[in-house]
Each structure stands twice: as structure tokens, then as C-alpha cells.
């Protein structure tokens, strides 16, 4: 089955259960077909591609294809982030909050299996839309003999509406593993329903390649998502992980150091000019997200390392806190 038909059937099945946004795959392909008939082949510079300044013979770039795709991507990422955050907040909530949810009659979320299935559905939704976007941009480049699709993807990443960059995708993958592991530890039998016919996502795994941790999941469409869990600052497994708005993951204390802030003040006080150590993008610290599910997963999977790192970080945080309050005291007394 061709991906377009597979995607349309998947989205149709989802919309019967809940009204959720998607990529207008068929509509965008029709735009490209018209472009194929009218397009005069010509090479377009990479700079022009970023600015979307195509030749006039190409009706696709004349305020049609990219604006339409951009709006759909914003809707997809916005819906995914909102629902993923709600699900994760429910899982990490106190017993009282969970009790209120149960009393309100949200039967799907109140049981263990319901949480697993909803998390799996959200990851599947994110991945199948990511594949749809990748394929339609690849088709665009093929028809135009250009790199505009790749340039658009780069621009979207800078705008932070690339779904694979979402910290909530990483959190959902860790959440999925955590729930399955806790089910095993409790000794309960895991009875999962067969995967949907058109599902791409078949589960996640935390793997170690030469001691380096990777959070990964396989797609049936020959695409693999790997999230490197090695902090590029301390070159060790991320501890108390945090995701910057550019999508890169660091230890919380390493991120504070890179942003030139004290752990007492936190990343919210970072200057807008401070840049990500990897991509050098600025303004990425204030919207950083704590990866609590990933923190739980790594704590469970790397017990010895976690305990050793916890002791080291505790001593360092206490030292930083002491220096911070000593400085505040001296400033107040004028000494």
C-alpha cells in the first residue's frame, strides 16, 4: 500500500475517534501535480530556497504549497504537545489528582493499560505525521530539482515546529518504557491489544552502544528515531535531563553552566543572547523543559551511575547555593 493511502486511512480512523489535525497529504500532492505540468526545470540557489523566491513559472511557491504545509505542521505540533503534556502531567501527578481524574469518569486514563495505549497512540501520531512531512518535501524537491524542501525543513526547525524536535516526544518514549517496566516489576501480566493495521510505531527501547545510551524506536517505514542521551558538555549520560527549545538535551547543571547562571537562579534567568553549545542558536534556555519521565527511566536503568552522580551533584549544588547566598548577604550588608 502506498504511503499516501496508508496515511489517509490512518487519519480517517483517528478522526472517527477524535477530531485531530493532520497533513493534507492528498491536497499537497495535487498541488505538486499541477506544478509538474507547468514547471519549467531550472536550478534554484539555496539562498533563494530559504527565502522562497522561486521562478515565476512555478505556481507552487506562489503562496500556496509552503504556507499551507506550515499551517498544518503548526496545528499538528500544537495538538501533539498539548495532549502529550496533559497525559504526562496525569502520570506524574499526586495520588489526589489521580483520584479526581478517576472520580470524573475518565475511564481510559485511570487504568495502567489505558495510559500505555494513549501514550502509544500519541507517539504513533507524531511519527506518522513526521514521515508524511518528510515524504511530501522529498517529492517537492524531486519535481523542482531543487533543495527547497530541505531548506524549508531547516527553517521549520529554527521556528521550533519540527515534531521530532519536541521534548514531549522524548518524554512519551520514556513514559512508554517506564509503564511497561513498572508493569513487569509489579508481576502483572501484560495484555496488550494487537497494533492497529496502519500503525507505524511498534515500541521504544533504551539501548547502550559502547556504553552510550540511546532512546530509539523503529518505524515500519524504514525510518529510525534515535535520541542521543549523552550530554555534549560533560560527555556523560544526561543527569536531571533538560531539553532546550532547540531540541538538544543536557544535564541541568551543565545547561546552567553553559547559560552562565547559578543553579539557584535557574535557566529562567538566562540572557536571551546565550546560545546552545551544539547548534549555537540563541534564546533557547527560558523555554527549557525538564524531562521527568526520562529522568525516571535513566535512574531505573543506570542505578550505580545514578547514585554516584547524585552524590556528586548534591555536593556541587550545595557549594553553589552557599556561594550564592554568601554573595547575596555581602551585597545586602555592603561588605
UniProtKB/Swiss-Prot annotation:
A zinc finger (RING-type) spans 231-280. High expression in roots and stems, medium in seedlings, flowers, rosette and cauline leaves, and very low in siliques. Detected in cotyledons, hypocotyls, pedicel, receptacle, pistil, sepal, filament of stamen and at the two ends of developing siliques. PROSITE patterns: SPX, ZF_RING_1, ZF_RING_2. Pfam families: zf-C3HC4. One of its GO terms (cellular component) is plasma membrane. The keyword Protein biosynthesis does not apply. Pathway: Protein modification; protein ubiquitination. GO terms for biological process: defense response to bacterium; plant-type hypersensitive response; protein ubiquitination; regulation of salicylic acid metabolic process; response to benzoic acid; response to nitrate; response to salicylic acid; salicylic acid biosynthetic process. The RING-type zinc finger domain mediates binding to an E2 ubiquitin-conjugating enzyme. Interacts with UBC8. Interacts with PHT1-1 and PHT1-4. Forms homodimers (via RING domain). Interacts with UBC24/PHO2. Interacts with NPF2.13/NRT1.7. Interacts with NAC92/ORE1. PANTHER family: E3 UBIQUITIN-PROTEIN LIGASE BAH1, E3 UBIQUITIN-PROTEIN LIGASE NLA. This is E3 ubiquitin-protein ligase NLA. E3 ubiquitin-protein ligase that mediates E2-dependent protein ubiquitination. Plays a role in salicylic acid-mediated negative feedback regulation of salicylic acid (SA) accumulation. May be involved in the overall regulation of SA, benzoic acid and phenylpropanoid biosynthesis. Involved in defense response. May act as negative regulator of resistance to the necrotrophic fungal pathogen Plectosphaerella cucumerina by modulating the accumulation of the phytoalexin camalexin and the salicylic acid- and jasmonate- dependent defense pathways. GO terms for molecular function: ubiquitin-protein transferase activity; zinc ion binding. Changing residue 279 to A: Loss of activity. The keyword Cell wall biogenesis/degradation does not apply. The gene is NLA.
Amino acid at each position: 500500500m502506498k504511503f499516501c493511502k496508508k496515511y489517509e486511512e490512518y487519519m480517517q480512523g483517528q478522526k472517527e475517534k477524535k477530531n485531530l489535525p493532520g497533513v493534507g497529504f492528498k491536497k499537497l500532492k495535487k498541488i505538486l501535480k499541477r506544478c509538474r505540468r507547468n514547471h519549467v526545470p531550472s536550478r534554484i540557489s539555496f539562498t533563494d530556497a530559504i527565502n522562497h523566491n522561486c521562478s515565476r513559472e512555478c505556481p507552487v511557491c506562489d503562496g500556496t504549497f509552503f504556507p499551507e504545509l506550515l499551517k498544518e505542521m503548526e496545528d499538528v505540533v500544537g495538538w501533539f504537545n498539548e495532549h502529550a503534556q496533559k497525559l504526562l502531567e496525569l502520570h506524574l501527578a499526586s495520588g489526589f489528582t489521580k483520584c479526581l481524574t478517576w472520580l470524573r469518569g475518565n475511564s481510559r486514563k485511570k487504568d495502567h493499560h489505558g495510559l500505555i495505549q494513549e501514550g502509544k497512540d500519541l507517539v504513533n501520531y507524531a511519527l506518522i505525521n513526521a514521515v508524511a512531512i518528510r515524504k511530501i518535501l522529498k517529492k517537492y524537491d524531486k519535481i523542482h530539482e531543487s533543495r527547497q524542501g530541505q531548506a524549508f525543513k531547516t527553517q521549520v526547525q529554527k521556528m521550533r515546529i519540527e515534531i521530532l524536535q519536541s521534548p514531549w516526544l522524548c518524554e512519551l518514549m520514556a513514559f512508554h518504557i517506564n509503564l511497561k517496566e513498572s508493569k513487569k516489576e509489579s508481576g502483572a501480566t501484560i495484555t496488550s491489544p494487537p497494533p492497529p493495521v496502519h500503525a507505524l510505531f511498534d515500541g521504544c527501547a533504551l539501548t547502550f552502544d559502547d556504553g552510550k545510551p540511546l532512546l530509539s524506536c523503529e518505524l515500519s517505514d524504514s525510518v529510525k528515531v534515535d535520541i542521543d542521551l549523552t550530554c555534549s558538555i560533560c560527555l556523560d549520560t544526561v543527569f536531571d535531563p533538560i531539553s532546550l527549545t532547540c531540541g538538544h538535551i543536557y544535564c541541568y547543571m551543565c545547561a546552567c553552566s553553559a547559560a552562565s547562571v547559578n543553579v539557584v537562579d535557574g535557566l529562567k534567568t538566562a540572557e536571551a543572547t546565550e546560545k546552545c553549545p551544539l547548534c549555537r542558536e540563541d534564546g533557547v534556555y527560558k523555554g527549557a523543559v525538564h524531562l521527568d519521565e526520562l529522568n525516571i527511566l535513566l535512574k531505573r536503568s543506570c542505578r550505580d551511575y545514578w547514585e554516584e552522580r547524585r552524590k556528586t551533584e548534591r555536593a556541587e549544588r550545595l557549594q553553589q547555593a552557599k556561594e550564592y547566598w554568601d554573595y547575596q548577604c555581602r551585597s545586602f550588608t555592603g561588605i
